[in-house]
Amino acid sequence: MKITKNILKAEFIKRPNRFQAYVKINEKIEMVHVPNTGRCKEILIPGSTVILREENNENRKTRYDLIAGYKGDMLISIDSQIPNKVVYEALMNFKIEILKEYANIKREKTFGKSRFDFKLEKENGEVYYLEVKGVTLENDGLTMFPDAPTERGTKHILELIDVKNKGMGAGVLFLIQLNGVKKFTPNHKMDKNFGEALRLAKEKGVDILAYDCLVEESSISLNNPVSIEI
């Protein structure tokens, strides 16, 4: 998907809270919005180069969103709104092999007390619920989720098991918001409960998928499947 708004580079200064950061643009310090509540400590390092998206909304306190950052030569998208958009584009273009037969794609649909990112249906009425998780944590080609404890994420995984137990299809797709990685694994040290829930989900037949992305400063798209170790 293309990012149609104005894109520019800046120098990262600091992040005083989850939603705000300070950057240097043309020698001027400016506060920007961070559209990611994760820690992103390995990306948002003082002095590093980050990518901003200009919003031009007079009702906002900040003019820019901080949407990506360079980790060395590697560009990593950190915008938490991006994964669902990328996966939706991939589903519409039948790029996810095991989901190609699901032609009816609905977003943000409820099952029981749960809300999942996608509800997919085949022509014969077969239903599949898909949850998407964005991944930004990487170390030497190994990617992990989460980068902060996530009770909500664990809840989603357990709810997918419930979907599967009721005879429907269920899956979680980890969208790795960078390119050229080797493997994905749950971050057991950060959130043991999430890792255990994911292992149980696999045992119960929930599909566990991971894809990396082709990331450029003004575009991002689904790339290739990534091996998973749970």
UniProtKB/Swiss-Prot annotation:
Signal peptide residues on this chain, from the entry's feature table: none
Gene Ontology MF annotations: DNA binding
Pfam family, one: SfsA
Annotated CDD domains: SfsA-like_bacterial
InterPro entries: SfsA, SfsA_C, SfsA_N
Gene3D superfamilies found in the cross-reference section: 2.40.50.580, 3.40.1350.60
Family: Belongs to the SfsA family.
Name of this protein: Sugar fermentation stimulation protein homolog
